[in-house]
C-alpha cells in the first residue's frame, strides 16, 4: 500500500529525512527557519511553537541529511564531521564567553597550557562538579574571548562530540553547539561559522 511504502521509506532512513522543506519554529519571541533535513528528531519537523529545537549538520558546509551523506549521519564515515546544535530559551544571563571572567576564571589556577592551535587550555576543578573537563580560551581579532568546554585528553574517545560551546542569539535564545575537538585546530573558522549559522537560522536576531 501507499502508506506502507511511505512508512517503510521512513524506517530505511533511520529517522533521517532528505526533505528540504523549510519549517518555521517559534521559541518564545524568536522565529527559526530550518530545513527539515537539518532537524534531528522527526517529531520536531513541523511548523509552530516549540520549547526547543535540535539540529545536526555536516561540517563545514552545514548541510542537512541527504542520501549522498547518509554514512556521515549514521556515524559510519570517519572522514566527515557532524555538528549538533540545540536552540532553547536562555537559562543563564551570560553565554559561555561571557561566563569566563565572572565564573570560570575564579576556578582556574595558573596560566594554563598554550596549545598549537593558539588556544589556552585550563582544567576545570572536579570539586566544582566538572569531571574530566577543561575550558579552552582564545583571543579573537576584536579582543573578545572565544571559549569552549571539552573533555580532557584521554577521556574524549568515550564521546562522539568532545566539546561544546553556547552563544546567545536572537531575542532570548541560547544555541548550544557540540562538536569534536579536532575542529578547534581552526577554531576561528568554527567560531565564525557558528555565528553565521545562527544568523541564518534565527530570523529575529537582535540588532
Residue ranges and their predicted role:
Residues 2-92:
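N-terminal Sec/ER secretory leader and immediately downstream segment
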Residues 22-27, 136-138, 168:
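Short acidic-hydrophobic surface loop/beta-edge motif
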Residues 27-31, 143, 172:
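Glycine-centered tight beta-turn/hairpin loop motif at sheet-sheet or coil-to-beta transitions
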Residues 38, 151-154, 179-181:
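A mature extracytoplasmic/lumenal domain signature
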Residues 60-62, 88-90, 140-142, 179-183:
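Short, flexible beta-strand-to-coil junctions
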Residues 68, 131-132, 158-163:
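Short, surface-exposed coil-to-beta transition loops
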Residues 71-153:
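Non-cytosolic head/periplasmic domains of membrane-anchored proteins
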Residues 158-207:
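Long, compositionally biased interface segments
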Amino acid at each position: 500500500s501507499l502508506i506502507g511504502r511511505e512508512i517503510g521509506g521512513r524506517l530505511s532512513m533511520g529517522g533521517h529525512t532528505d526533505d528540504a522543506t523549510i519549517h518555521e519554529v517559534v521559541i518564545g519571541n524568536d522565529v527559526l527557519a530550518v530545513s527539515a533535513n537539518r532537524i534531528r528528531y522527526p517529531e520536531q519537523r513541523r511548523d509552530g511553537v516549540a520549547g526547543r529545537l535540535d539540529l545536526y549538520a555536516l561540517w563545514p558546509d552545514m548541510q542537512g541529511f541527504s542520501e549522498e551523506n547518509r554514512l556521515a549521519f549514521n556515524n559510519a564515515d570517519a572522514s566527515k564531521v557532524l555538528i549538533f546544535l540545540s536552540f532553547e530559551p536562555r537559562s543563564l544571563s551570560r553565554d559561555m564567553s561571557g561566563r569566563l571572567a565572572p565564573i570560570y576564571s575564579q576556578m582556574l589556577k595558573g596560566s594554563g597550557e598554550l596549545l598549537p592551535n593558539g588556544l589556552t587550555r585550563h582544567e576545570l576543578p572536579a570539586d566544582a562538579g566538572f569531571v574530566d573537563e577543561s575550558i579552552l580560551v582564545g583571543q579573537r581579532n576584536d579582543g573578545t574571548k572565544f571559549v569552549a568546554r571539552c573533555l580532557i585528553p584521554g577521556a574524549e574517545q568515550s564521546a562522539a562530540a568532545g566539546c561544546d560551546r553556547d552563544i546567545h542569539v536572537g531575542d532570548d535564545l541560547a544555541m548550544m553547539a557540540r562538536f569534536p575537538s579536532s575542529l578547534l585546530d581552526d577554531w576561528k573558522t568554527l567560531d565564525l561559522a557558528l555565528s553565521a549559522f545562527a544568523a541564518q537560522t534565527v530570523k529575529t536576531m537582535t540588532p
